[in-house]
């Protein structure tokens, strides 16, 4: 091919892909193409960007290059693409040693537009000429007048304040620092908030000039496209203008340690949190993963040693009382992968015992051998995931591209980790001959390149750091001359003016845009059929699943009281993690993964669109399996639902402690979701339900039962037994299946026998109930047939939950009453306008929040929220001003086309088989018809400016509900007590 040197080609049969590696002769760019029939095309360009300090220059550059370029001189082309393209993926990511810019689309014209915008962004960005972009995306001094305090602000600055407020993120940062002190991994590529303000504009420009060059680029094309045509365009449009250079971006190996290193750090906890049993102990060791087989084997060891229920290393630490949550595992994707064992909820004084137990346990496993069933189960699970290639909302081509970078960046072939089938076959055989035990000895035991990181709690550390920063900035302000203060004020105002100034229409039109005619008019339909077998409703969706069945047993929770629902929420955590009548929980886990691609238990509330303010609560058993394992899997489901030994108080204590830890970690990682859910619980039955089984109320519940368990360890198990007995009955159940016709037929054939066996289980439980408690015979299980009252809602209120965080998650939620304001597809267009114009401009661009979002449901729920937000009062004021903005909304025809295309892009997200299985249940329970889907799409396509203005009443109603929740900085919440009905410490 002209101007390219073909380095090597391979056929990857597992992926039905023809792969080629090229080098662009003039610029030195590396190109990897993966040609196949997947219409969800992916383009990615990555640069090796080793961090030389912790100013976050790589991360800030990632943000900044997407703020306009020579060919597309808009202020925010990324946002314009987000709201005006049919992308199936659009983002950019900073890693410890690379920065990646991937896009994906199923539309050929759209895909070419996305490639063009991203390539111009990385090679010709405006940010290297305009310091205001660095100020906005990275950091700047902020002072509006002489009386104003001097502050730091910036999107990345605030994002990383949020990251550094999370103890697990802090721990990960210092693990890398401890293991690789002489390499780029010792620095924080995302940026340390204490160091980010040291980044100058000259350093920023120099970083881009050095690393953002084709000679340092790794370009990937994946999918159904004319590769020769794409490469010719790449050459002509961009690569040919560059001459090859040496970017000097090689990442050296860290010289191996000769002895264990130790590092001690602190993390912030609330004023009332305990300092005992609140330390993280982390043992970490650098491992060599020199080929794919070894890489997969280390990942499997992660599961066998740490992640599986009853994993021996995890169990040994828990039983020794060192930590109540053990996690870690194999971390790759960097030059030198490492293996970690982390104990959360430990004491620093136990560090020697922690190391001793790890060493003793591993040596015992090497000597006596690992559980072969556990190894085979882990291999089976990994291979199932690999073959299924279902990565949720991420296109599989993106996952393959990122996997290719795990080797390509370090001088190895990009397809090395994509060939897995033979490796799995070899590992099954090797497991019989001590391969994994030898790996433990070589990589984990006989390896001095290790570090112990101790992360200790410190009360009020966040507040101390905030006060120190305020003092530093006050001193800085006091040391300024009058001219310097005026210059700072002028710069702040100039930046605000720049942020508020809209991009000219002339520049907006330089960005390529599809037309409405490029969009399909037909909504994607649901195709389930309802059938009754043995008087059980089956919801059957027939489609090509490549021999995989997606099976869901759905149990209506109407039989449970409000007091019982949180117990059901905990039940989904317990099932398959305790002994049953036939299996230990360790053997049960292996049996499940030997015969399935995973079994999950979940709870969700589905609004009834035929009866507003009503919903259906469902406890679901979700499993994916190959058809030939159906009989065994159904037997396992019966066993788990009916013979779990809830009376095992020792095991229950372990699960409870881990659940308490994991729920806190979830809140720390996704505070915006919890804030929205909590606010919705004030007025919405579905919101209240989700709060009880997985929100802040559930977190409080877990803490209560954990505290009570020590004094009364038997009641919890009995309560779960009663909940399971009431819930898992035929009168509560319907089944949904997504599979090919032969898979559905196989289920229908086996179901009558399974149901009879299930009935026998229930009869046995009836006898057991008589033995356990004669008073319980009255038959609470028949409550499914009764009409239960809706959940008690607590009415509108604004709550503040203080955490040891430097940023906030600020949510408002409410109801617009669909009987007065009928749901319309125009609300999807309004969502795009708010997410990428109004909220984006006010909360992210001007306010410095990392994220902002809005949403409107078919049943009348609406919400607004911010993510890693330095503000609180200003954000709430922004929400309150929204109805006026919508009433006076104006947009050109081109702008409306963009909003409509963005809304359609969300509707047309490719559906995996697992997505289809979940959506079928949701649509069935909520009564969403194909006609409603088509009507919604028609309304989206026909949305006008007038339609948007008419939605101001909807938003006004949402805000008038008065429900709000803020999770975050105690300093901010305490400073604005008047905004809240109640405030409290979330973590106590």
Language-model segments: what does each one mean?
Residues 1-42, 258:
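Non-catalytic terminal extensions that flank enzyme cores
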Residues 35-37, 44-46, 157, 161, ...:
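His/Glu-based metal-binding/catalytic segments typifying zinc-dependent metallopeptidases
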Residues 40-50, 76-124, 131-142, 169-194, ...:
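M16 family metallopeptidases and their MPP-like homologs
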Residues 57, 61-65, 571:
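Active-site His/Glu-centered metal-binding helix of metallohydrolases
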Residues 143-216, 220-238, 242-270, 275-277, ...:
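Hydrophobic, small-residue-rich alpha-helical packing segments that form membrane-like cores
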Residues 153, 205-237, 717-751, 960:
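Non-catalytic, conformational "gating/processing" segments within enzyme and secreted inhibitor domains
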Residues 206, 218, 227-246, 368, ...:
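Extended, regular secondary-structure scaffolds
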Residues 439, 443, 702-717, 721-727, ...:
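Aromatic-residue-lined binding/catalytic grooves and analogous aromatic/hydrophobic interfacial grooves
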């Amino acid at each position: 091919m002209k101007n390219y040197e073909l380095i090597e080609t391979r056929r990857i049969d597992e992926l039905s892909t023809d792969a080629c590696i090229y080098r662009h002769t003039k610029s030195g760019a590396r190109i990897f193409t993966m040609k196949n029939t997947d219409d969800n095309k992916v383009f990615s360009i990555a640069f090796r960007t080793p961090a030389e300090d912790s100013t976050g220059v790589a991360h800030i550059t990632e943000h900044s290059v997407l703020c306009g370029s020579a060919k597309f001189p808009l202020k925010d082309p990324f946002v314009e693409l987000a709201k005006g393209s049919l992308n199936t993926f659009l983002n950019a990511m900073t890693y410890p040693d690379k920065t990646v810019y991937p896009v994906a689309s199923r539309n050929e014209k759209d895909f070419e537009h996305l490639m063009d915008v991203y390539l111009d962004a990385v090679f010709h960005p405006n940010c290297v000429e305009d310091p205001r972009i660095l100020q906005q995306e990275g950091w700047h001094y902020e002072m509006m007048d002489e009386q104003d305090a001097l502050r730091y602000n910036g999107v990345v600055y605030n994002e990383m304040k949020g990251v550094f407020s999370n103890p697990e993120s802090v721990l990960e940062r210092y693990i890398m620092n401890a293991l690789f002190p002489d390499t780029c991994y010792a620095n924080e590529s995302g940026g340390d908030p204490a160091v980010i303000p040291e980044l100058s504009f000259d350093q920023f420009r120099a970083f881009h000039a050095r690393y953002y060059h084709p000679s340092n680029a790794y370009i990937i094309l994946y999918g159904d496209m004319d590769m020769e045509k794409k490469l010719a365009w790449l050459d002509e449009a961009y690569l040919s203008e560059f001459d090859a250079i040496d970017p000097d971006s090689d990442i050296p190996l860290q010289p191996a340690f000769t002895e264990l290193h130790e590092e001690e750090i602190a993390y912030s906890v609330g004023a009332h949190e305990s300092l005992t049993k609140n330390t993280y102990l982390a043992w970490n060791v650098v491992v060599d993963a020199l080929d794919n087989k070894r890489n997969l084997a280390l990942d499997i060891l992660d599961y066998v040693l740490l992640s599986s229920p009853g994993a021996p290393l995890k169990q040994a630490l828990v039983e020794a009382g060192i930590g109540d949550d053990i996690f870690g595992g194999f971390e790759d994707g960097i030059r030198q992968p490492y293996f970690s064992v982390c104990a959360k909820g430990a004491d620093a004084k136990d560090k020697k015992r922690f190391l001793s137990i790890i060493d003793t346990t591993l040596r015992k496993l090497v000597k006596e051998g690992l559980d072969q069933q556990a190894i085979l189960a882990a291999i089976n699970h990994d291979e199932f995931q690999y073959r299924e290639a279902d990565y949720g909302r991420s296109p599989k081509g993106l996952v393959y591209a990122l996997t290719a970078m795990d080797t390509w960046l370090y001088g190895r072939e990009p397809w090395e980790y994509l060939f897995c089938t033979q490796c799995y076959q070899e590992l099954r055989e090797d497991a019989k001959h001590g391969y994994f035990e030898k790996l433990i000895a070589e990589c984990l035991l006989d390896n001095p390149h290790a570090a112990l990181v101790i992360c200790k709690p410190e009360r009020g550390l966040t507040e101390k750091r905030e006060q120190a920063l305020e003092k530093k900035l006050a001193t800085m302000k006091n040391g300024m001359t009058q001219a310097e203060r005026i210059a700072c004020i002028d710069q702040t105002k100039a930046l605000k003016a720049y942020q508020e100034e809209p991009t000219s229409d002339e520049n907006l039109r330089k960005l390529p845009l599809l037309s409405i005619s490029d969009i399909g008019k037909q909504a994607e339909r649901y195709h389930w059929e309802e059938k009754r077998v043995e008087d059980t409703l089956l919801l059957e969706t027939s489609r090509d699943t490549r021999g995989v069945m997606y099976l869901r047993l759905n149990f209506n929770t109407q039989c449970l009281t409000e007091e019982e629902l949180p117990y059901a929420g905990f039940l989904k955590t317990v099932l398959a993690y305790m002994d049953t009548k036939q299996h230990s929980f360790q053997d049960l886990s292996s049996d499940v993964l030997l015969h399935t691609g995973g079994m999950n238990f979940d709870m969700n509330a589905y609004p009834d669109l035929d009866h507003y303010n009503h919903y259906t609560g469902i406890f679901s058993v979700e499993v994916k399996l190959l058809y030939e394992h159906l009989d065994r899997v159904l037997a396992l489901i019966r066993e788990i639902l009916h013979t779990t030994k809830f009376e095992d108080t020792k095991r229950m204590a372990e699960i409870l402690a881990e659940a308490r830890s994991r729920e806190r970690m979830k809140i720390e990682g996704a505070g915006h979701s919890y804030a929205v859910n909590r606010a919705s619980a004030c007025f919405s039955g579905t919101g209240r339900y989700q709060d009880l089984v997985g929100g802040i109320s559930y977190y409080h519940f877990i803490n209560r039962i954990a505290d009570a368990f020590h004094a009364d360890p038997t009641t919890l198990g009995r309560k779960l037994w009663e909940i399971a007995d009431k819930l898992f009955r035929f009168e509560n159940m319907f089944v949904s299946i997504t599979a090919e016709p032969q898979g559905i037929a196989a289920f229908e054939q086996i179901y009558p026998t399974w149901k009879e066996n299930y009935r026998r289980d229930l009869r046995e439980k009836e006898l057991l109930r008589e033995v356990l408690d004669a008073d319980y015979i009255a038959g609470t299980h028949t409550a499914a047939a009764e009409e239960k009252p809706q959940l008690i809602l607590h009415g509108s209120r604004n709550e503040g939950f203080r955490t040891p965080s430097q940023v906030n998650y600020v949510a408002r939620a409410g109801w617009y009453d669909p009987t007065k304001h009928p749901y319309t597809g125009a609300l999807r267009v309004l969502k795009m306008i708010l997410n990428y114009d109004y909220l984006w401009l006010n909360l992210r661009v001007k306010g410095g929040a990392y994220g902002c979002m809005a949403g409107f449901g078919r049943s009348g729920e609406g919400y607004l929220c911010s993510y890693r937000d330095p503000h609180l009062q200003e954000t709430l004021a922004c929400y309150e001003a929204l109805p006026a903005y919508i009433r006076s909304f104006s947009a050109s025809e081109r702008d409306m086309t963009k909003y409509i295309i963005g809304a359609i892009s969300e509707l047309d997200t490719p559906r995996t088989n697992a997505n289809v299985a979940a959506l079928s249940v949701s649509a069935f329970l909520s009564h969403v018809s194909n006609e409603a889907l088509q009507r919604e799409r028609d309304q989206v396509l026909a949305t006008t400016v007038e339609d948007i203005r008419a939605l101001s009443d909807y938003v006004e109603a949402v805000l008038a509900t008065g429900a709000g929740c803020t999770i975050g900085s105690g300093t901010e919440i305490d400073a604005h007590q008047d905004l809240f009905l109640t405030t409290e410490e979330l973590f106590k």
